[in-house]
Amino acid sequence: SLKSAITDPKALLERLSLPNELLEQAQAASQLFPLRVPLEFLNRMELGNPDDPLLKQVLPIRDEFIQAPGFTEDPLNESDARPTPGVVHKYKDRALLILSGACAINCRYCFRRHFPYSDNQLSGEHWQRALAYLKEHTELREVIFSGGDPLVTSDHRFSKMVADLEAIPHLERLR
């Protein structure tokens, strides 16, 4: 269950019988991007192995503070393609809807770790603005649900969004 996910670096290290020397850097780096590891994923990791490949996907490390030349916090160049909150429109005939910033697991290599999810919540007025934008742009044929993980959206809310999008005649595909 998502609610029982490990979010504390100390708890992760203890559960995996890993040395406390990893704790300071894990706590510091988790301030940059939070730790989130579902128990089902954690249970597949090898106890006592700091080089476990699954652990390396989720363990915050000090290297996350390195500023590498040529790297950017917006690797997909989405900041200039957000015409209204929650909508990313980079390609002529398709747009992304950012349904949620939440994921079941926070991978350290996440390309959207710096995405301003709090400014892109698709609720209330933002949802109405997103719908208006999608209706106005008749070149759009496809809407792609994205996030975080769009499937953490409640069934009721997701169904309502799909129904609203199905009412836009020029949209042919939802994925």
Q: What is each stretch, according to the model?
A:
Residues S1-K90:
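Flexible, acidic/Gly-rich N-terminal and inter-domain linker regions that tether
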Residues A102-N106:
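Short pre-active-site segment immediately N-terminal to redox-active cysteine/selenocysteine motifs
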